[in-house]
Regions:
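Nucleotide-sugar donor-binding catalytic core of glycosyltransferases
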Residues: 1-214, 225-243, 260-281
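Conserved acidic donor-binding segment of nucleotide-sugar-dependent glycosyltransferases
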Residues: 244-250
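Short alpha-helix at the nucleotide-sugar/activated-sugar donor binding site of glycosyltransferases
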Residues: 220
């Protein structure tokens, strides 16, 4: 089974212009996957200006017309940034990107998905293990997130829902600057975290560093319906049939009748195996 993540999307592209030299630091590369016969070009958004320069001097040879795919970034793409990218590359036919906040006829949103497999919280074997367990849904709403990921947005969420749905994990999260502390924390907690999601009908998923959040897709893979606030990308995902509840403000959560019947109505016959690149093209 393929999990949606930045690495998965990159490997759909014949020309891949970004890699990682270690767990944290990305690097511009010029890699042509000869096994893929397509005009898809993958680039981390932060390197698009550099790519334009390299293309002009001939260091990178882009197709005359191509489809761009950007991922592995927290940049939210609004109208101004979209125009900037098309000014750099007027020969783009289609562009697929995460964190898309503006409607454009040539640009389509793709999910952040789960963490990349180079990260401990993107360990796909761990996901498959929990997905293979039979989890009876015994919890209505699961609330567990690191407020420090996006303090303003996440405190807003917490302040508006905590009377009814308090934060379940009040343990201190590790120092984000330490990869080892992060990995130790994930290795000791993620299985139970995923099990709690799987046992819950609904999972609260406030925005992350970018508007999309790994938790949204962790919930979907655990067959829990994510509750998110509205932005362009999630509206499009919902239109594709991906089960989620979209609200405009977290104060609305208290008015939702979050029942097993609502879960069944929204989830319907959705199959997580349909989550692949073709769904978003």
């Amino acid at each position: 089974m393929n999990f949606l993540c930045g690495t998965y999307f990159k490997h759909q592209c014949g020309l891949q212009l970004t890699d990682y030299k270690n767990a944290r630091d990305s690097v511009f590369v010029n890699f042509k996957d000869e096994s893929l016969d397509n005009n898809l070009v993958f680039c981390k958004p932060e390197y698009l200006s550099l790519l334009s320069t390299y293309a002009k001097i001939g260091s990178v040879r882009l197709p005359d017309e191509f489809d761009l795919l950007t991922h592995n970034s927290d940049i939210n793409f609004d109208a101004q940034q979209i125009d900037y990218v098309f000014d750099l590359f007027p020969n783009i036919n289609n562009w697929y990107t995460q964190n898309l906040v503006f409607e454009h006829p040539k640009v389509k949103p793709i999910p952040i998905g789960i963490a990349n497999p180079k990260w401990s919280h993107g360990n796909q074997s761990r996901f498959l293990e929990i997905m293979g367990e039979s989890q009876e849904k015994t919890n209505k709403v699961y609330v567990n997130f690191n407020v420090s990921t996006n303090p303003s947005a996440r405190y807003d969420c917490l302040n508006k829902i905590s009377d009814q749905y308090p934060l379940e994990n009040k343990n201190n999260y590790p120092n984000a600057a330490s990869i080892q502390d992060h990995d130790n924390f994930v290795d000791s907690t993620q299985k139970d975290y995923l099990r709690y999601i799987a046992k819950s009908y609904f999972t609260v998923s406030p925005v992350g560093n970018g508007l999309d959040c790994h938790k949204t897709w962790e919930a979907i893979y655990m067959k829990s319906i994510p509750i998110v606030t509205r932005w362009h990308g999630v509206e499009k995902f919902q239109d594709m049939g991906i089960p989620m509840i979209i609200i405009d403000d977290w104060s609305e959560l208290k008015d939702l009748d979050l029942t097993a019947n609502l879960y069944k109505k929204i989830w319907g016959d959705f199959d997580i195996k349909t989550l692949n690149f073709n769904l978003f093209t």
